Regions:
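Extended accessory regions or peripheral subdomains of proteins
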Residues: 15-61, 67-106, 142, 146-241
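Intrinsic-disorder-associated, low-complexity terminal segments enriched in Asp/Asn/His/Tyr and depleted
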Residues: 5-12
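ATP-grasp fold ATP-binding core
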Residues: 64-66, 132-133
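FAD-binding glycine-rich core of flavoenzymes that anchor FAD
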Residues: 109-130
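Exposed boundary/loop context
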Residues: 7, 73, 127-131
Length: 241
């Protein structure tokens, strides 16, 4: 397999160090095509909720809290916004939203669409990150059980809501409450060895843009948007890693 050309390039921005560095990134690109790149910053000025306020731009966002034993907050909180892809279903109809375009399909198993979409990615684990560092985050409604079990016909729906709804974003924030640190992660998609440098640059730029928003003062009133997802760890589906 051809390898990335790493002889001339190591990416830093001022004093900002990204993990993995470019040489290690190229090595990882030989094992898979989705490599997480991250920067770590102190969490002394932000909480998951305050960061959510700064990142939410009125589109789709999520705050995913980890729970231990169903009663105690876990170590990590995960935040994401502005998804690249949205997958939602109602009955046998699945809609895939990407770049503002909506594609509809009639299927027997809506979850198979998520698996099919993610099958083109081979994520690579990077030291220093928890098991979850990206993937499809969302919910499954009660009626989704009809795709797994032979049940009587459903009663007419009283709510105009989707049976399932998943967001896929390539960049997320990981709050580590034990170490009081935030890891800003961007999953770089390497389509070919010649794409390594561009993919790494783009990931680093996305990370810096998010950190810039975190460090900017938050002004004005804010309320939870109607399309924000507040989730617990039991609702993770097909997490990378």
């Amino acid at each position: 397999m051809p390898t990335c050309d790493r002889s001339h390039y190591l990416y830093y921005l001022g004093a900002h160090v990204f993990f993995p560095d470019y040489a290690a990134f190229c090595d990882l690109a030989e094992k898979g095509n989705l490599i997480p790149v991250y920067r770590e910053i102190m969490a002394d000025m932000d909480t998951p909720v305050s960061a959510f306020k700064k990142l939410d731009n009125g589109t789709f966002s999520f705050l995913l809290e980890s729970i231990e034993g169903g009663e105690k907050w876990g170590r990590y909180s995960f935040l994401g916004s502005n998804p690249d892809v949205i997958i939602r279903s109602k009955g046998a109809c699945v809609e895939i939203v990407s770049n503002g375009a909506v594609t509809s399909r009639t299927v027997t198993d809506p979850l198979a669409c998520i698996k099919e979409l993610l099958a083109g990615y081979t994520p690579v684990e990077v030291e220093g990150l928890p098991r979850f560092f990206g993937g499809a985050v969302g919910y499954l409604g009660y009626d989704m059980v009809r795709h797994f079990e032979n049940l009587p016909s459903a009663k007419p729906a009283l709510l105009d809501s989707y049976d399932s709804y998943f967001l896929i974003t390539d960049t997320i924030l990981i709050f580590d409450t034990v170490r009081q640190k935030i890891k800003v992660v961007s999953n770089a998609h390497v389509t070919s060895p010649s794409n390594c440098e561009a993919a790494y640059r783009e990931a680093c730029s996305k990370i810096d843009a998010i950190i810039g928003r975190l460090r900017a003062p938050h002004t004005g009133m804010w309320s939870m948007p109607h399309n924000a997802l507040m989730l617990t760890s039991i609702l993770i589906s097909h997490a990378c890693g």
